[in-house]
Each structure stands twice: as structure tokens, then as C-alpha cells.
A protein has these predicted regions:
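Double-stranded RNA-binding/processing signature
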Residues: 1-118
Length: 118
């Protein structure tokens, strides 16, 4: 819950400050590339494959995965909630530098992959 809010704020802040988009509907549409459960799932898989996360962070991600969903793609939802849980945990523990490291990688990943076309 909190991690989702932190991510939403980081994305909106990034888009307002660093994109050339000016219209609100364009900013909202662009934000969907970052805040969708699919982008979270693909990004967390990238982090796991590249050993970007510490062992403790992987454990937090795994414990934070929500197993109940009414959505069709439960794996996507579980990975997304695990990623949001990790961000929320880091926020509550005042690990803001680590949040920014992960978010910088997230921006790079979204901007360099086909997630922008989803």
C-alpha cells in the first residue's frame, strides 16, 4: 500500500520535472508505463536476474507477494505487490538512497525496454 504510493509519487515527480510532456492526460498516460503491474513484474524479474537486490531485499520481496487476487494474471499481481512491498519497507526504514537507486534503475529499464509500448 505505502510502496505503491511512494512509486506513484516518484513517477509523477520524475515525469513533471524531466519529461517534455505538459498536458495532464499525456503525463497520466506516460505514468502508466511505470505504475502498471506488468511493468512492476518485468522490472522485479530484471532485478532478480541481475542480482541488483540484496539478499534481505529479495526476502522482503518474497514475503510481500500478495497471493490472493481477483485478477486473471496472479503471477503478475504477486510480483507487483512484492515490488511495492519492498519499496514500502525501504521507505518505512528511511532507506531513501536505496529507493532512489532502485528507482533510477527502474527509469532506465522502462525507458530502454518495450514497456513504453504497453
Amino acid at each position: 500500500y505505502l510502496g505503491d504510493s511512494v512509486l506513484e509519487l516518484l513517477v509523477r515527480d520524475y515525469l513533471v520535472k524531466e519529461s517534455e510532456l505538459k498536458k495532464v492526460n499525456e503525463l497520466c498516460q506516460e505514468a502508466t508505463h511505470f505504475v502498471s503491474s506488468l511493468s512492476h513484474e518485468k522490472f522485479i524479474l530484471h532485478l532478480l536476474e541481475t542480482d541488483f537486490l540484496t539478499e534481505e531485499e529479495v526476502g522482503i520481496f518474497k514475503r510481500g507477494r500478495n497471493t490472493k487476487t481477483s485478477k486473471r494474471d496472479t503471477k503478475e499481481h504477486r510480483y507487483s505487490t512484492g515490488f511495492e512491498c519492498l519499496i514500502g519497507h525501504l521507505y518505512l526504514n528511511e532507506c531513501k538512497d536505496r529507493i532512489y537507486e532502485i528507482f533510477d534503475e527502474f527509469k532506465r529499464y522502462v525507458n530502454e525496454t518495450n514497456l513504453r509500448q504497453i
